[in-house]
């Protein structure tokens, strides 16, 4: 089929280029409770993953993506911009933030970009959703691996106090209440735990192998 140009000459109509099927990227998650060192280890891991595979990763950290936004909203709601642990935050803002992170992850996975996601995601992991990524809205065929970073509560508290982040104030002031939210993750082949009490190069190497899929059949 043809159409006429403004000069009157026939111009062939363009046909849309068919979209090629794209395999979704891989979703890697560094999870665990506060103060365990998730972000530090995730940054170290993503550098190793890129060096080993040559693949780029979209790095998505919860605090970077939503830190300033949450401070503004909580300041309006409670007068405390540093609140990240009170019932007000957990009941009214927490799920919206996590949904936004998952939306961003999905948009990058769809065209084939792999994603390194950093955040607690405790509810989602305990519900088993990261073991079935389509339940999180991820593209069909998305492969997910989880690094759960462990640290005993006393050492976690020491590190939280040491980092002196105002966003931890509510948590520290209500420590016993916060401890009730600490859970043991479910067992699944997609999840590997790492004790970060003292950095262990060999154990970290095994974790990176797991993230690359080497530990699963």
Q: Where on the chain are the PLM-derived regions?
A:
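The conserved Walker
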Residues: 34
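Extreme N-terminal, non-catalytic leader segments
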Residues: 1-27
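Conserved substrate/cofactor phosphate-moiety recognition/catalytic segment
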Residues: 46-96
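Hydrophobic anchor at the beta1->P-loop junction of P-loop NTPases
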Residues: 30
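Conserved phosphate-donor/acceptor-positioning beta-strand/loop module used by diverse small-molecule
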Residues: 139-160
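Glycine-rich phosphate-binding loop used to anchor ATP phosphates in small-molecule kinases
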Residues: 89-140
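Walker A/P-loop
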Residues: 39
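Small-molecule kinase domains that catalyze NTP-dependent phosphoryl transfer to phosphate-bearing small molecules
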Residues: 162-207, 217
């Amino acid at each position: 089929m043809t159409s006429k140009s403004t000069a009157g000459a026939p111009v062939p109509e363009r046909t849309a280029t068919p979209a090629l099927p794209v395999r979704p990227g891989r979703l890697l998650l560094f999870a665990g409770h506060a103060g365990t060192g998730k972000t530090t280890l995730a940054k170290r891991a993503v550098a190793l993953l890129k060096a080993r595979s040559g693949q780029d990763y979209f790095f998505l950290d919860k605090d970077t993506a939503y830190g300033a936004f949450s401070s503004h909203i909580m300041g309006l709601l409670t007068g405390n911009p540093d609140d990240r642990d009170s019932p007000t935050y957990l009941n009214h803002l927490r799920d919206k933030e996590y949904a936004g992170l998952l939306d961003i992850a999905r948009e990058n996975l769809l065209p084939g970009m792999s994603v390194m996601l950093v955040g607690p995601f405790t509810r989602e992991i305990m519900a088993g959703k990261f073991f079935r990524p389509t339940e999180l809205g991820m593209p069909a065929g998305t492969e997910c691996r989880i690094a759960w970073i462990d640290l005993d509560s006393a050492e976690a508290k020491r590190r939280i106090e040491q980092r002196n982040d105002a966003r931890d104030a509510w948590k520290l002031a209500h420590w016993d209440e916060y401890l009730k939210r600490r859970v043991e993750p479910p067992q699944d082949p997609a999840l590997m735990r790492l004790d970060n009490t003292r950095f262990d190069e060999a154990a970290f190497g095994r974790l990176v192998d797991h993230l690359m899929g080497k530990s699963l059949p």
